[in-house]
Amino acid sequence: MGLAKRIIPCLDVDNGRVVKGVQFVDIRDAGDPVEVAKRYNEQGADEITFLDITASSDDRETTVHMVEAIASQVFIPLTVGGGIRTCEDIRRMLNAGADKVGINTAAVFNPEFVREAAQRFGSQCIVVAIDAKKVSAEGEPDKWEIFTHGGRKPTGLDAVEWAKKMVEYGAGEILLTSMDRDGTKNGFDLGVTRAISEAVHVPVIASGGVGNLDHLVDGVIEGKADAVLAASIFHFGEYSIQEAKQRMTDAGIEMRL
């Protein structure tokens, strides 16, 4: 029996509001972060991810007081990302009540930071977030590249190789977002999800593109993901967490109901 699979609603926070964009650009308001997080906690989400989406690109620190406010209302694991660049940033987030931190852009510029963070705080709280885009042409072997700064800057790094390297350096989890799928509601990029899930021995969280509950099922069964992350299908009331868990259970996936 494997570990139960997880459903993780994601709060993309911009200037103190939960927002949801399409391919990281076109933004729509989804409410107050503390209220939204509280609702998911009550609905039975397994974890919550809070991403300060302006932090890295605008070089702004993640809002510590908001993390404190969410942590005081939420009793499931909370991952916080956005603008995490130093061990001091990590310490502040963990002290504010985060259980894990997501490192994205900073890992690309300074991979040693991941090693240092894992040694200091433990791999269990270090999540490396990977934003990948498919770069292979039709008919070529599949290849995905890492992008930074909210999907705007290509790095030349191969996504699968990078994931393996980050796990070697101490990442305890990989949060994989397909930039091609983000906000499209067409489902996860199952190719890159499966490639990375099969390449590393730590949990992989699939993100980017969920439009219905069957996409969550596909992420686990076909994509081999350990957890599935979604935003807009939950934020705007199309589906509840319980409906999602029921659909996944019906498909034979072990869930915490």
From Swiss-Prot:
Top-rank lineage group of the source organism: Bacteria
CDD domains: HisF
Keyword vocabulary terms for this entry: Amino-acid biosynthesis, Cytoplasm, Histidine biosynthesis, Lyase
GO molecular function, one term: lyase activity
Signal peptide: none
Keyword Disulfide bond: no
EC identifiers of the protein: 4.3.2.10
Catalysed transformations (reactions): 5-[(5-phospho-1-deoxy-D-ribulos-1-ylimino)methylamino]-1-(5-phospho-beta-D-ribosyl)imidazole-4-carboxamide + L-glutamine = D-erythro-1-(imidazol-4-yl)glycerol 3-phosphate + 5-amino-1-(5-phospho-beta-D-ribosyl)imidazole-4-carboxamide + L-glutamate + H(+)
Subcellular location: Cytoplasm
Top EC class, one word: lyase
GO cellular component terms, semicolon-separated: cytoplasm
Keyword Cytoplasm belongs to the record: yes
Catalytic residue positions: 12, 131
Major site of localization recorded for this protein: cytoplasm
Alphabetized InterPro entries for the sequence: Aldolase_TIM (IPR013785), His_biosynth (IPR006062), HisF (IPR004651), IGPS_HisA/HisF (IPR050064), RibuloseP-bd_barrel (IPR011060)
Pfam families per record: His_biosynth
Pathway field: Amino-acid biosynthesis; L-histidine biosynthesis; L-histidine from 5-phospho-alpha-D-ribose 1-diphosphate: step 5/9
Biological processes, Gene Ontology terms: L-histidine biosynthetic process
Function noted in UniProt: IGPS catalyzes the conversion of PRFAR and glutamine to IGP, AICAR and glutamate. The HisF subunit catalyzes the cyclization activity that produces IGP and AICAR from PRFAR using the ammonia provided by the HisH subunit.
Similarity-based family: Belongs to the HisA/HisF family.
Assembly and interaction partners: Heterodimer of HisH and HisF.
UniProt protein name: Imidazole glycerol phosphate synthase subunit HisF
Species annotation: Marinomonas sp. (strain MWYL1)
Gene: hisF
